[in-house]
């Protein structure tokens, strides 16, 4: 088939703002984000778009439920990275033939959203106490709606190809049904309980937190050594009360070290280790708690660390989790000294009531000192638990809460990992997952908030029983009384999020979506929520659906600034994704993030980082514009009917190898490897070599040769656009649109009609018939000669535009020990050079290329280098600053040698060679060979200049 192409025009300047919004609108208009499906003609309210869906032809599915961003504001760069990686995978899988579904949605984010609303009210001079629960929730709904619109806009600008007809919210009606079903099911299975327990309490948020919602920060503090008066034995026996504290009355004392002197007010015991010889005689004695004159016993417990402080510790069960355990073992009273807002309550002396913990600490330390009871104070740095949202210091607090028994759920999740039902990428996170599950504690799921899923439990005032129900109830299930009250608390946000993979598909209803798309394929998220979300989703999937909710877990790094610091407003180091898009375009943003996202590592960026992605997108635009310009008026043939040159076969071979690398990398979630492979192919192999070489064909008068070259370029451009599309969807779709339908038909790349979009075209596949080692070796020899000339010109400071005279001489095995093994593959370098003389001269800027016999003398005025099987002489009549040239070559050699040593160390690491993917190890070996060849070449330059490689310098 042949077509004569009409004029194809791309604007001369790459301007992403001119087409990105239009391209995305086109995708949405054509419903390109929906799974490949057909309507059955019957109504199904559970369907994504109001119609039932049936997977066409039993195609394999690939499903991701987006990690729902919080509705508290705009998406930051971390969300952006996460979105880009998911979209790359979804676009790749869609083009690779999978029936893909990417479910978008947002999270109600209980604590965080309530903070936002309370802050907004305070700006208006309104306190939360002044509004009703219903008014507060209504105000929160308004903020939620506004922020959801912003999040949708941002995701669209990033190019997210999610199915918007399936969008969910963790507090929508369907999710509420799922949450209630999960709660009641756990209750019926005996995995839920309500108990007075010591919880992590945020006094600023006014709610309990789970262990995983407490972050730890290193803070300056003090270790206070406090004297506790020891009661005389006579008073102990008589159960006497000591006199009021005063310096004169303090007799024998014991010394206890504490970082929290304010909790002395709730002490109920002092503990020592039972094997501590220093205190054997004190076990069973009694002491007086300072400031409150409470008489408490000295007990023995093996938890006590003999090397901490003095080896004696105060026991405050209501305000320390370890003390709570000790108190439980010894049946000690738990005295709660705090109000919910963190102030001291009426369980303490009047002088301290109403003070915050920080204020009480200052006052008590002063009082201890005044009474002669503060032995000393030692400044320390210690770990302090803070709220993950507001960073207020967490207080252990005794309160009535709902808990999930986690050990039975964790055992299932561990068993699934052992069966390899779940795969972690990178694998190092498996250890973190296992360690957390093996040491898991029960999960506190109740939160003292107004925004969230209300706990579906009603308490009866008549019979004091509780009713747990999937639906709202009006009467007690036990006595029938109407005097019932629903639990005022809401559930932890993560209680809805852990159901996300299947609740988004309609669970607990057995919907067609659930049958078709569950379990999902993968979860892609940051490593910092492996506990909050990933592990819990696996447990929920196994408990409620009897299967893991996904097979692959890809945990990417966090986005930080160039100094490795977390991005924050206080540091003013944040990078706004929308600003990047406005400045460089969405494709630049996407490609840069993918290129820099190495598995298991954080991504360090700054504003200028995105120039790389911008340059690459611009390169794609300009190269495509050149190719399309040369297609005008040409007769383009189907590639099957084109006679390919060896250069053509080389580029198809190289493209073929790249396709295999990219597909392998994407299947393994190695995004940076895939991005680097497409970058290397397009910029170097395709543009710098093949497109440049094609200019020779278009400069010839032979019209048939021009048509042949145009046909190959047209095919390569179309296939390359498909290869690049998951990374650069906007620019590739826009360029593809510029290819006329006749090009599509001619290349037979995609079927006509519905799949006229690039994003719906098939992804390139590895084609064994395109492998051509001979062409690869020959063009490799051409490239080596051209690179040698270019490098030598640069080293001599010769203008790239100035033509030079070159002599090529075969090297003998004695001159080049590495050549012998490779010459058989390359054949005669001289013969290859003669075949491609025109191309070599054009690419290297050579005016005269002369071939010498192996025993010919070196030209008189020349600088030389050596390659695989040849010596190359650059003849020049101009004077060369040999000292400067030697220095330049010396520095270049040192850098090349350091590269050799770096890769050698990596390959000498048995762990790396054993555990790294085979293609990664192969790539490193290729790097080593290339680095050694560079060293060899540079050493040849130095030898020719009568210099020699010098010692290595770390600074070079």
From Swiss-Prot:
Q: Which InterPro entries match?
A: aa-tRNA-synth_I_CS, aa-tRNA-synth_Ia, Anticodon_Ia_Val, M/V/L/I-tRNA-synth_anticd-bd, Rossmann-like_a/b/a_fold, tRNA-bd_arm, tRNAsynth_Ia_anticodon-bd, Val-tRNA_synth_C_sf
Q: Which GO terms describe its cellular component?
A: cytosol
* Compartments in which it is found: Cytoplasm
Q: Which GO terms describe its molecular function?
A: aminoacyl-tRNA deacylase activity; ATP binding; valine-tRNA ligase activity
Transcription regulation among the record's keywords? no
Q: Which reaction does it catalyse?
A: tRNA(Val) + L-valine + ATP = L-valyl-tRNA(Val) + AMP + diphosphate
Q: What is known of its domains?
A: ValRS has two distinct active sites: one for aminoacylation and one for editing. The misactivated threonine is translocated from the active site to the editing site. The C-terminal coiled-coil domain is crucial for aminoacylation activity.
PANTHER family recorded = VALINE--TRNA LIGASE, CHLOROPLASTIC_MITOCHONDRIAL 2 (PTHR11946:SF93), VALYL-TRNA SYNTHETASES (PTHR11946)
- Please report the name of this protein according to its UniProt entry: Valine--tRNA ligase
Q: What is the lineage of its organism?
A: Bacteria, Pseudomonadati, Spirochaetota, Spirochaetia, Spirochaetales
Please name the gene that encodes this protein: valS
